[in-house]
Structure formats: structure tokens, C-alpha cells
Amino acid sequence: MYKNYNINQLVLPLNLEIKIQDNDIARHVNNLVESIPKKAFDKYYKETGCPAYHPRMMLKILLCAYSQSIFSGRKIEALLSDSIRMMWLAQGYSPSYRTINRFRSNKEMQELLCQCFIQFRAQLIKEKIINNEAIFIDGTKIEANANKFSFVWKKAVEKYGISLIENSRRIYDELVEQEIIPAMELEQEATINEKEMVEVVEKLDSAIEVMDKEIAESDSVEKRKRIRHKRKRPKQLRKILKDNIARKQKYDRQLAIMENRNSYSKTDPDATFMRMKEDYMKNGQLKPGYNVQIATEGQYALAYDLFPNPTDTRTLKPFLDVIESSYFALPEYIVADAGYGSEENYVDIIENRQLTPLITYGMYLKEQERRYKKDAFKTANWDYDNADDYYTCPNGKRLIFKYNSQRKDKNGFARNFRVYECEDCCNCPYRSQCCKAKEGNNRKISINVKWEQQKEYIRAQLSDKKTGKIYKRRKIDVEPVFGFLKANLRFNRFTVRGKFKAKIEMGLALMAVNLRKYMQHTAVV
């Protein structure tokens, strides 16, 4: 006996909503997008032209597709014909893949995604899933949609640029020495700039034209032969100079694209070459990618941004600015790992924002070890006399204050140091263990007072029962979001190019992670 099956018979229900379960991902997508205020969609509205697909519908089908690990515009278009979820959300409409891709990369899409995150966070707070006490920040690297061999390195461009200028200067000196062109007033005696190179080519053109005219007017075979021989070298040099000018312009364009970065990809100029965690060949190969920063609570991504620099330290300040300006007011506690611990970041959070950083620094775990605490040659373990301002080394010698110094990093942040020097390191039995200075020189130490105070403050915060408990949640709060994104959602590489489009796609992927997590939560409840 078989169940009744007839392909030619009308099947009920015609209303697809009946087929969608109450806790289905499509319903959560629908509820989230419907909660976004109508004002957020006003920029899409146009009085003229063919009526457009409603942006609410387009956003719903994108979020639903991303939640099912479908990122391609063509595959999303196919889902609109195959998936009951997508048919219900689209209400029978079937936008083409071109329409889907154009909507995904629309200039208004970023603001719309911000509204998604804001509404989703408000819902979590309302349902008391999160308490807005702290945010947990971390970053991961996602590979860009670019060829891994399309690299341009800043050092190489600068090296070839210098070589090109030197070569052009030698050509100029040769032309002047042979009296082919007259000497020029250069801005700098030892070098030559692009404008001056163009002027040299113009003078060289004039000199070659004169030679051409002499050849045309001369009746003597020997004279014409002599002039042609004389003209040969200037023509070669002119060709080299023209090539140098074109290359100089290319190098300038490349440096302008690079800005403060050390590399970029020709396929996606916004992407920077960095080491990925997914290094299957174990050879440290650099790939073009973006540094994705997220802020989470309760394992939900509440804000995000993309950065071109591979290190997390320089991303914290601009990321906190983005959170405040586009998402929500910062809570009392900012929690992150040691990759974000720096004097500049501590100053920004404690002094400028008046908040509490629960961020370890590079040597924090090392300093907790018994071996480190018992090491007599670590300056952190040396006795300090606050009244007379000196340190005492393991040999009982005093290190007296000598002078103040200031160091600036490449970002322009200034750090102040107090330099102390030992009275006498000669004949010290511990010299080989304590001092790396040359024989005859005394041991010097540089103490950053502000940095030491900040480290003491962080140690106190992490030792406190309440704040220490909050910091311990970091690993189980922010890391699972990346695990879900890469392992479950299988989002390991962008499908679009350019930072603007990549940021939109990252927002769609993170919101898809949030919705799937929220679906699991509501199913348990």
C-alpha cells in the first residue's frame, strides 16, 4: 500500500506561511526586518521609474540566504524558486541575481544593516538575554576575494622609486656633460623630480628635432652619418626617461592607494596582505584579507567593522568610535585580550572615555608565573626608593635617575620614559646575567611611569572578584561567534571586492549568525 500520490492533482494549502514552523529561521528574519522603522527605507523610495522591489523584501531574502550559507547572487536567485522559506519571504517575487547583487552593494545598505543590529540588540535587552554591562571585543582575519599573487609591496615600490630617480639623475648629468641639453635649475642638487624629468624630455625632443632637421638639409653622406650616430644616444636616453616618468607616476599611484599600509592587492586594492590562521601549508604564506573586529555580549555580535591593518592594537580606538557613532553607547566595561593592551588604548578608554578596560597586556600572564617573580634580574622585581628616586640592582648598586626621554611610534603617539643608570657595573659578578652593554658601560634602564601605573591598574581590576569574573567570560563570549561564522556558516572568504562591499557582506553574515543563535535560544526556552 502506498500513500496517495498524484502529480496532476491540486495540492493545498496554497498559503506558504502554513508550511513555515513557528520557530523557523524565516520567521525570525521576518520579525527582525519588520521591526526596523519605516524611515530607514525612505532613501530607497523613488517617485519616478519602474516600481522597485521593496527593500524590506530584498533584505529578508538576503538574510535568509546567508543564514543557510548561500552567498552567491545566482544561488540566491535559484533559492527563490526552490525554497518555501524564500518564496514566503519574497511573496512570489523573483528578483534576478543582478538585482540582488545591486541591492547588496547599494550605498544605503550599510546604514540599513546598522539599523538591523540596533533593533536586534534592543530585542535582546528587552528579553533580558543580555544586560548591557560589558562588551567583548576580538578580531579575526577573513580572506578577500582577490588573487593571492596580486601583491604590491610598499618597500619594493619605494626601493624602485629611489632607483628610478637616481637613474634619471645620471641621464640628466650625462646629457648636460655632453652638451646635448643646457643645464637646468633643479630644486635639489642631488636628485630630480617628475616635473624636471618632463622638462628634460622636452629639451631632448627639441635637440633631436634640430638633429633631424640637419640630417634632412645636409647633402653630405658623411655628415648625415655623423649626425645620425650623434643622435642615437639621445634617442635612447629619451626613451628611458619617458619610461621612467610613466613608472614614477605608477609608483606614486601605488603609494597613494597604500596610504599607511605595507601592501595591497591589485585585484582588491582595499585588501592588505596578512597571515591567516588557516595556513594549510604551514609556511606563513601571506594572503589578501581584512581584519574583522566585532563587539559581542551573550555570544551575539552587536557591532562590527573592517580594518586593513593586521594587528589588533591599532584597531581598538577607531572601532570604539564606530560603535559609539553608529550602534550604541559604550557600556562600563570594555573587555579584550592582550592583543589590544597598549598605553595608547588604556589612555583612550580610562582618560578620554571614562570607562573601565578589562584588557590584559603582553606580559601579564608571564608576570604571574613563579619563575618570573623569583627572577632577580627582572627590573620589575628590583627595589625602588620613592624618596630618593633610585633602583637597587641584585648586586646592591644604585641606578640613579639621569634624564627624561620621549619616544614616538609610527602612529605619532608619544611615550615618556625616565632613564636610570647604574653607579658602577665594573667587576660586577652578575654582569653577564644582568647587563648587555659593552664593557666599560654601565647598565641603563628606561621606565615608563604611566605604563607601569596602567599595568598596576589592570592587575587590580583583573584581581577583583566582580571584574575578574567578567573578564573570564571573554573566551566563551566572543570566540564562539567566530567559530560559528567559519565552521557552521562556512563563511571563510568574501564573495565581493572593495572594503565597502565587504563590510556589507560581513554584516549580513554576522546577522545570520545572530539569527541562528537566537533561533536555538528560543527553541530551548
How would you describe each model-predicted region?
Residues 22-63:
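Basic, short loop/linker segments at the boundary and entry of helix-turn-helix/winged-helix-like folds
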Residues 1-27:
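Hydrophobic alpha-helical membrane-insertion signals
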Residues 86-91:
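Secretory-pathway/luminal and periplasmic proteins that interact with or process carbohydrate-rich
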Residues 21, 49-57, 68, 72, ...:
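Generic, well-ordered alpha-helical segments
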Residues 2-4, 62, 69-82, 93-94, ...:
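Anion-binding and metal-coordination hotspots
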